[in-house]
């Protein structure tokens, strides 16, 4: 495996990942995982805005790389998107007066930072595979969270729909945070530093049942959510 298939480059604003075009994507995945693990001390606890360049990725490939960063780096990933500043002929520093046009450009990761609107942010719509929704406070999703999507908040997370992606509440270490969803079937559920995954056989069948996830004595519990009136 070519160790240079994936190169990490620290920048003033975060991290740039340079991906080679030639290797199979399985090699990119393995190299990415190795690089993340070897840089664990650098990433752990950091807040990173990440850009990638050098290789055009489809939605599924972007989703896989994002999951590696979120699950294995120990960092809080605040953005993950294609580098918009890639210019033709970078190697010989030749600038061009003509704009770089890309027809049928692959849709980039959509990223929602959250505007200062108080302590709770409402996100309206479905969070799709490859999207990262992150907020410093409580987060309410008015829609579904699809597999391959990632939602994070330093406070509580409420999903008014089916939650089937990666969810991280209390991302700043707050173990008092909770996760509530009308249908709770995430690929990964995390509160503070406590992580769990659903059993393989679990699935949302028929009418979903609202559920609540919380931490008590460093154990993550999931139970039916029956709010009192």
Swiss-Prot record:
Q: InterPro entries, per this entry?
A: CAP/MinC_C, MinC, MinC_C_sf, MinC_N_1, Septum_form_inhib_MinC_C
Disulfide linkage: none
Any GO BP: division septum assembly
One Pfam family from the record: MinC_N_1
Gene3D superfamilies for this protein: 2.160.20.70, 3.30.160.540
Job description of the protein: Cell division inhibitor that blocks the formation of polar Z ring septums. Rapidly oscillates between the poles of the cell to destabilize FtsZ filaments that have formed before they mature into polar Z rings. Prevents FtsZ polymerization.
Which family is this sequence assigned to?
A: Belongs to the MinC family.
Q: What protein does this entry describe? A: Probable septum site-determining protein MinC
């Amino acid at each position: 495996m070519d160790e240079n298939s994936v190169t990490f480059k620290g920048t003033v604003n975060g991290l740039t990942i340079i991906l080679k075009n030639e290797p199979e994507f399985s090699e990119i995945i393995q190299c990415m995982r190795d690089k993340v693990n070897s840089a664990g001390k650098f990433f752990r606890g950091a807040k990173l805005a990440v850009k990638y360049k050098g290789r055009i990725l489809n939605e599924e490939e972007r989703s896989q790389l994002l999951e590696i960063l979120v699950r294995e780096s120990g960092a809080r990933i605040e953005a993950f998107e294609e580098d918009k500043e890639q210019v033709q002929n970078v190697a010989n520093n030749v600038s061009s007066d003509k704009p770089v046009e890309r027809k049928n450009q692959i849709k980039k990761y959509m990223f929602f930072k959250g505007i200062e609107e108080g302590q709770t942010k409402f996100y309206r719509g479905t969070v799709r595979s490859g999207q990262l929704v992150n907020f410093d406070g409580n987060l309410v999703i008015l829609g579904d969270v699809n597999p391959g999507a990632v939602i994070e908040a330093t406070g509580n997370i409420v999903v008014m729909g089916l939650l089937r992606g990666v969810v991280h509440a209390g991302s700043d270490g707050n173990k008092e945070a909770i996760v509530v969803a009308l249908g709770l079937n995430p690929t990964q559920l995390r509160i503070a530093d406590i992580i769990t995954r659903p059993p393989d056989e679990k699935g949302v069948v028929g009418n979903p049942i609202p559920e609540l996830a919380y931490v008590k004595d460093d154990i993550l519990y999931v139970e039916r959510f029956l709010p009192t009136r």
